[in-house]
Amino acid sequence: MKKGRNYIKTALFMSAFFLMSNMLSQNDVLKLLPGSKKANYYESNDLLKLEGNVHFEYQGNTMYCDSAYYFEKRKIVHAYGKVHIIKERINMFCDSAFFNGESERAKLWGNVRVRDLDYRLTTDSLEYISTSGRAIYRNYGTIRKNGSNEQIVSKIGYFYPESKNYFFSDSVVYTNDGIRITTDTLSYEYSNQKTIFNGKTHIRKDSMKMICNYGWYDTKLNKGYLHGDASYEDSSQVLYADTIRYDEKIQEIIAKKDVHLINEENNFVLHSNFLYSSDSLNLTYITDCALAKLVQNKDTIFLHGDSLFIRNDSIEKKKNIQAYFGVKIYNKDIQSVCDSLWLSQTENQIKLYHNPIVWSENSELKGDSIVILTRDSIIDKIYVYQNSSAIMELDSGLLYNQISGKNIIAYMKEGKLNKTDVNGSAVSIYFPEDEEKTDSTTTIKRMGLNKLISSTLSVYLDSGEVVGINYVNEPVGIFYPMDQIKEKDRWINNFKWNPALRPKDEFTLTDR
């Protein structure tokens, strides 16, 4: 979000149009001043014709022109050629002007210019209707601030001096010191310095771009509201939403409904129905179908939770994410659930708390807490703390290899679980295989159940099958042939297999 105060002062318009209002409402007669070369009065037509360096006062306004026609009874003045009207510090110029006191209308034609100490308006023609307090230009007008780059251009402009409201339509363009706003219609409320736009609107300043279908901008408080296909873009990210509220002064953004934030600098995408972002707090918060997509080299992690808090590491340009309630992770190599999570791209860690479960291929890891470590954006190790277990499904769920202990370190290789180190009260239950070969076939059969108990165990795995076990202290072991296995011996303590909880893909992560 960029800071700035881009608003239009309206002293020029108010003064100019109150000038015309005075000209139409006062009852003074025309007062001829020295300088006019020729004056003729035609009584039959009630016409005073002035020619040559015409200089007169009418209803409190000083006027210059090449020629003028004054109809006193009808309260009409026609002025032609180099028309110049002065009212205090206001100057108005045009090729011709018409004033009708009875209908309370005034119109200026040809190279119309209105200026004061601050602003100047140029247009082809200008009309003022005193009864409605409305001034109009219909064939393009340009407003510029003296001594600056501030400018607004539109095909049509309406001004309401009494209510201090102004309206521009058709090809409206506002520019000032690098900012450019283009829209179909723009209203300006002088009392609270608010611009209101309707129709497709584009706002650009330096690397910042904003788009919406309608909304408003408070130029005094530097607050804005964008609605309808709204977007906000800067050098590092793009935000899309149905509505976007932003506060440039305190650097905050609030987005609602169909929110999508794409950060190309840090390679992540956020989706939700509500987003709050604060540059000063270094925080982005999303909720309501919240989903984060983290792209790391060729690997992608999808993260869902009821609430996600994202903080920036401005030095390393990485993200730290906290997720709460109903947390789910989907990755091509692992999937997980828990109730709270802390993810640090800076430290290459994902910490899972409160009933965490991690799945990899046919393996399921559980514990009181789990820490996932990555190396070069690839999942490297998984630490499982307290009441730890690893379960590997075999033969389509008929059997399960199982490991349990106080703590477990699971090692990943090419996205697959290939080793576990169990520390403290280590237990391993597995079903070794045996090959029976005939002349034409090889049959794999389960030999039985092997159970080992030790203080520590290192178990080597291949697709969930135990291919080797190392130990420091001699374990206690027992083997049961398949036909002698008792039900109580088949399971580690607190065995539970949880396939229904496992995230299936990134598209259903936000499903409840």
Say what each PLM segment does:
Residues 1-31:
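Bacterial Sec-dependent N-terminal signal peptides
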Residues 23-512:
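N-terminal amphipathic/hydrophobic interface segments
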